[in-house]
Amino acid sequence: MTVKTRFAPSPTGYLHIGGVRTALFSWAFARHHKGEFLLRIEDTDLARSTAESVNIILDGMKWVGLDYDNADNVVYQTRRFDRYKEVIAELLAKGDAYYCYCSKEELEAMREKAEKEGTATYDRRWRPEAGKTLPEIPAGVQPVVRFKTPLDGVTKWTDLVKGEISIPNEALDDLIIARADGTPTYNFCAVVDDYDMGVTHIIRGDDHVNNTPKQINILKAIGANLPEYGHLPMILNEQGKKISKRSGDTVAITDFGAMGILPEAMLNYLARLGWAHGDDEFFTTEQFIEWFDLKDVSPSPSRMDLKKLYWINGEHIKITPDGKLTELVKPRLALRDIHETEKPALEDVLALVKDRAQDLNALADECLYFYKKQVPAEADVAKHWDDEAAARMLRFAERLEGLEDWNAKAIHDLFKPFCDEEGIKMGKLGMPLRLAVCGTAKTPSVDAVLALISKEKVLKRIRA
């Protein structure tokens, strides 16, 4: 059997971080088992679904690196209405579905009664049964189509995350599978799609647990083999509440890219939200695919931790090849009015500073002083700069100017003799030198920094 999983987002807005985590686990499961990962766009909500939102989903999937095996044949539900109508007609013909002519007022009264009695919402008054007389069909009413849910027994499955789940059928409504205007409903479309796509494992959020028994019963009615189900726990924000844009949480996957997060780091972090491989916190995408197993997914909600995300991102920055990192940082430097034609070469700068930042924006800022002296912080000036330091910098500039070979070793070899002559420790030279040349007291090894900036620029900055 070829494992087939799917990700089925609705194009009604941004691509939510929770949705991406669901897609990631579904993708990793398929890749681990050498199977197929499929994309389906659930766009039956015609009022809210937009082409722009579809593009946001596709762009988000591309950014985060989740490739899907039906890229040339992505399933769009709005293109499959004829197929849904065909299956509905089959269910009606077999007696597994029926027309319901209830008015909104009747349904509201049933809902209120059901809330008081703790029963299923719909009283099945239009459900055909042997020996039952149905109401007279009202004039001018367009009916909905309901699925004929089994009344006896239970619907149960072994959830790949939550374990055994059993729902009494008497607790289930006769689900509406087609609205009065003829359009099919979500639960029905999803079932037909999963059947036609050959999906073997449905991995999704645990907000779909209540949909599962309804969908299982429909699958049985159309004669389908049942897939296996795994329902993933919710992701909470740092306060332990549901992630919400209204609460100020970052929820759209593209926002994390703007924050300077690498897609590899995002996948690494999302993988750890609910799944574990021993004590491993940092790993590559290839390792994740090799290690992934749904039995290692916790059924309990996980909580966002942005500090950990940034730490993981910093670790991924360190192992990113300098050439690739250059292409990622280059546009961020352009926004800071630093362009690729300027010296020193950005790739050389990044090789020196890449372990000093936890996101690409901070990394771009870390590069700035190689191209333009920055305005030093008042606290650094107060601590490391005075008239004596200024005079000492001018004396050291004379030593630098005398160097024939401009490289880190040659610059480093000047430090000890100069400090001995001045009767100072290295800190009294290094910190003011950083301020004079870079505008900050926090840099990598000062000899390496000066070597990259160039002799001409270093002397000009010191003597400015």
Curated annotation (Swiss-Prot):
NCBIfam families: gltX_bact
GO terms under biological process: glutamyl-tRNA aminoacylation
InterPro entries attached to this UniProt entry: aa-tRNA-synth_I_cd-bd, aa-tRNA-synth_I_codon-bd_sub2, aa-tRNA-synth_I_CS, aa_tRNA-synth_I_cd-bd_sf, Glu-tRNA-ligase_bac/mito, Glu/Gln-tRNA-synth, Glu/Gln-tRNA-synth_Ib_cat-dom, GluQ/Sye
Chemical reaction(s) catalysed: tRNA(Glu) + L-glutamate + ATP = L-glutamyl-tRNA(Glu) + AMP + diphosphate
Disulphide-bridged cysteine pairs: none
Organism for this UniProt entry: Neisseria gonorrhoeae (strain ATCC 700825 / FA 1090)
Description of how the protein assembles with itself and partners: Monomer.
Enzyme class: ligase
GO cellular component, one term: cytosol
Transmembrane domains' residue ranges: none
Sequence similarity: Belongs to the class-I aminoacyl-tRNA synthetase family. Glutamate--tRNA ligase type 1 subfamily.
Motif 'KMSKS' region: positions: 242-246
Example of a GO MF term: ATP binding
Protein name: Glutamate--tRNA ligase
Residue ranges annotated as motif 'HIGH' region: 9-19
